Amino acid sequence: MTLSGVAAQTLRDVQVIVADQSQEPVTHSQVVQTLGRVIEARGGSVEWHSREPIHGIAEQRDFLLKRASARAVLYLDDDVLMEPWVVERLLDTLDSEHCGFVGAFPAGLSHLDDVRPEQHIIEYWNGPVSPEAVDPGSPQWERWQLHRAANLYHVSQSIPRDALPRLYKVAWIASCVMYDRLKLLEVGGFSFWPRLPRYHSGEEVLVQNLLMRRWGGCAILPSGTYYSQVPSTVLNEAGTVDGHALDLLAEMIEQYTRMAPTVKTTT
């Protein structure tokens, strides 16, 4: 599903890096092979990496970042489908706003009839995206509620077409996120992965928090992305995680943002 969306993008010159930790390599699928050929025929390239052992999602992201060479890197989960314009809009936004990252959060359309107006609170960027410190537990941290169920989709459907697209503020964003590669490296990337247990979460929450403090971050509305809601692979047998990357936040703020310009604090 994910490669189908990549193969249909208006932006064709893409370097796709697939880091596969499936029990059966995805390249055994004729459909997957065909989609890879379509991407190449349209002017892109595809690298296939079947990887063992499994150290967790932060290590996967670290591996992918080390393989990347473009100025912008898109982390795309393997259960996300993009509309054809998404990558181009993300890149245009990253270029125009000069921020650390831009996201396109996917809607879970199984929640299409689950309308939650109390969670439809959205803060727009009405000017240039700018640095901000969004601390855990602050009122701004509650922005994450917008990314539950199909909330973002419902918000986008309630806005007149001529008022879109818009950029909005986030606490963090997952599943489809484009980063400025050099800025991501300036805050250490995902090199902290050896300090986390195998089953962990929050690796993107951590790096995005650091990036927002120095350069800001945002997300696009409408997002143009949808996810299939398949079971997560980051959870242990009990259905939980053994550690969260945000436990490292305080020391990484000191390490990577202490020499940066003062930012607006939103606590």
Residue ranges and their predicted role:
Residues 1, 159, 165-182, 186-267:
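C-terminal catalytic/acceptor-binding lobe
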Residues 5-49:
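Acidic donor-binding segment of Leloir-type glycosyltransferases
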Residues 51-68:
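Glycine-rich, basic loop-to-helix element that forms the pyrophosphate-binding segment
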Residues 70, 97-99, 215-216:
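Short, high-confidence coil segments that cap the C-terminus of an alpha-helix
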Residues 73:
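Short aromatic/hydrophobic "clamp" motif used to bind/position activated sugar donors
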Residues 77-81:
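The conserved acidic donor/metal-binding loop of glycosyltransferases
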Residues 85-144:
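Conserved donor NDP-sugar-binding/catalytic core segment of glycosyltransferases
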Residues 134-154, 158-179:
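A recurrent flexible, glycine/aromatic-enriched loop bordering the glycosyltransferase active site
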